[in-house]
Amino acid sequence: MNSELFSPYTIKDVTLKNRIVMSPMCMYSSENEDGQVTNFHLVHYGTRAAGQVGLVMIEATAVLPEGRISNKDLGIWDDSLIEGLHKTTTFIHDNGAKAAIQLAHAGRKAELETDALAPSAIPFNETMKTPVEMSKHQIKDTILAFQQAAIRSKQAGFDVIEIHGAHGYLINEFLSPLSNKRTDEYGGSPENRYRFLREIIDSINEVWNGPLFVRISANDYHPDGLTVQDYVQYTKWMKEQGVDLIDCSSGAVVPARIDVYPGYQVQYAKHIKEHANIATGAVGLITTGAQAEQILNNNEADLIFIGRELLRNPYFPRIAANELGFELEEPHQYERAPGKISTNK
């Protein structure tokens, strides 16, 4: 039986064997607080590759030490971190998948002892510290840090880079009028609020020619915040700059009540795909093969990002294939265990 979910997908010169992407999820497991990959990361990501995920995207990886969400985040701010990341991509490639990295800066959500940086001195909520408004020098240094991180990503063997522009972290803070009250060229109009991300994309394009994704929060869930229609213009600009795919998440730039249900963010992937004419990834409570297949068949997205379901079961692709009646080619080491596997959770 044919399946869209298990059909290949090519972006530039990178071909994914199927449409399943492991969504980036922080593991907070750099136990020495030095940003280094540990044995846990090798097993964690290698197992999902062996489980037949098409693209394994490692977690938000900080471009600067002060840009970590926590002290135990992975980092890519120094050349000494390349070796561990290269081991990770080798594990992923050896098990049949492509490897992606999400480059990130936590901004005002950095829970560290040092000052948190943000476009404006506005805390996320009443319990978190008030960040320091970034100077233009700090902005330029951060843009350079993203560029240097892209160089290291290439040296580490990654096939795809994703820029983390969602979930209330630094880039998202610049994009949203709820967190960006600047009066210079980095604040005010949508064009100005986009400038920080524009300059990051330009800087990465100077050193990286592989597939480039951007994760967005397509809805601020606030009456004065951004909606998916605002992101249509942002993503049109991203496409003009050469971004290949928009990973469509939502929320977390300010505290908000969100009506969560299966596939609740698919609408954003569909809207951006249709109105910005750019490839999209759907993410958020996608938990079955049938659900993923329907999203693709309805042309609502091009890739399916799976998060918590892959934490529950690293062999989710096998379960999805069984559900869809698709004969998935197994790793040769597992050929002695043919047939269906349980879908019980």
Swiss-Prot record:
Q: What is its EC number?
A: 1.6.99.1
Tell me which UniProt keywords the record has, alphabetically.
Detoxification, Flavoprotein, FMN, NADP, Oxidoreductase
Has keyword Oxidoreductase? yes
Give the reaction(s) catalysed.
A + NADPH + H(+) = AH2 + NADP(+)
Against CDD domains, the record matches this protein to:
OYE_YqiM_FMN
Entries under InterPro entries matching the protein: Aldolase_TIM, NADPH_DH_bac, OxRdtase_FMN_N, YqjM-like
Q: Name one GO molecular function term.
A: NADP binding
Reading the lineage from the top rank, the first entry is: Bacteria
Q: For FMN, which residues are the binding ones? A: S23, P24, M25, C26, A60, Q102, R215, G307, R308
Cofactor names from the entry are: FMN
Read off the Pfam families from this record: Oxidored_FMN (PF00724)
Give any single GO term for biological process.
Answer: response to toxic substance
**Positions bound to substrate:** Y28, H164, G165, A166, H167
Q: What class of enzyme is it?
A: oxidoreductase
Q: Oxidoreductase among the record's keywords?
A: yes
Q: Which family does it belong to?
A: Belongs to the NADH:flavin oxidoreductase/NADH oxidase family. NamA subfamily.
Q: How does it assemble?
A: Homotetramer.
Described purpose of this protein according to its UniProt entry: Catalyzes the reduction of the double bond of an array of alpha,beta-unsaturated aldehydes and ketones. It also reduces the nitro group of nitroester and nitroaromatic compounds. It could have a role in detoxification processes.
Output this protein's name: NADPH dehydrogenase
Species name: Bacillus cereus (strain ZK / E33L)
